[in-house]
Amino acid sequence: MPKIDNGPPDYRNNLPPIVEQNYGKWEYHESPRPGVLKHVGPAGALYSVRCASPRLVCVDFIRDVCALADKYCGGYLRFTSRNNIEFLVSDEQNVEPLIEECEAQGLPVGGTGASISNVVHTQGWVHCHTPATDASGITKAVMDDLFEYFQRDDLPNKLRIAMACCLNMCGAAHVSDIALVGIHRTVPRMDHEAIRKGTEIPSLVACCPTAAIRPDPKNKSVTIVEERCMYCGNCYTMSPGMHIMDAKNDGVAILIGGKVSNARTAPSFSRMVIPFLPNNPPRWPEVTEAVRHIVDLWIANARRGERLGEWVERIGWERFFSLSGIPFTDKHIDDYIFSRETFRTSAAFKY
């Protein structure tokens, strides 16, 4: 077939030789140390050396990483879904020298097994057009505080943290153990002149998920039913005249208990535990302290093998709020039209 520039390349054309030879024949996998995975098959062993990356990187950084791959593993590496770098090493003698050089270049090795892996985050103030908070800044502050857990693998289970700078949540925050979500709290400020000059009114009305935006033919603009607005910012995507960002009222909510894994219990969505924390750059101390508090509570009380959400479900959400000291308010009650599906339907409570 002729080559076409459509979609990703066939992954089979880029596999390391050891992976091709062992494909479908792997015998077992083990973790010799935090940050290193060993995969064994009939044709030999492959070592995955995992180190963290800041996700938003420059060309020079990529060149340095590729130079390490050329030197120690024949140029074979990959980026994980959590923005870690994995060097695919087929020669065991190259593992330790690679780790030493990674550490020397400021690339910490870790994030495997029962640890806190790299934080998935969205664009934030760097690039997103509807952010309620920054993504890179909070990620840096939180992981600086939790860095010791990246290089250990003795936690109750793996812990996944995600950061989304707005409710669009392109950072998979809804299925992470701890999710940091930027939230807007005020309705968009309408610039009617900008709306009239540069907006398709039908598209703007149709984009609102709660039908809060209504056409205003008299003014050739729109109106907003404030009671229906959920502050998602989707309307700003359709019109530059719908200003959603508010430096005073925007902030961060914290959700916990989500997971994608189907092991032990079914996949689950995260649930909100802290409805609002202020934006205090550059280090976001309130957010960092809250995350550290939740992580320490989980480590101290969870059983071996329990994800954060599994631990909370075992002891009950009532007990979690009691242990954590986080106040339970009316903001925790889901008022979405279909939220009844998620409500507890029995009289069994856990205190």
For each of these PLM feature ranges, what is it?
Residues 9-16, 22-57, 120-124, 270-276:
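Short glycine-/aliphatic-rich beta-strand segments at the starts of folded cytosolic domains
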Residues 16-23, 49-199, 350-351:
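Small-residue-enriched alpha-helical segments and adjacent helix-cap loops
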Residues 89, 93-101, 313-332, 337:
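Terminal amphipathic helices with adjacent charged low-complexity linkers/tails
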Residues 203-224, 228-253:
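Iron-sulfur cluster-binding cysteine motifs and their immediate structural context
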Residues 284, 291, 297-306, 311, ...:
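Long, compositionally biased charged/polar accessory segments in the mid-to-C-terminal portions
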Residues 74-81, 112-113, 152-158, 215, ...:
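Flexible, glycine/charged-enriched surface loops at secondary-structure junctions
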Residues 119-122, 160-167, 308-321, 341-342:
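A glycine-rich phosphate-binding loop feature that marks nucleotide/adenosyl-phosphate handling sites
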Residues 259-302:
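A hydrophobic, small-residue-rich beta->alpha segment in the mid-to-C-terminal subdomain
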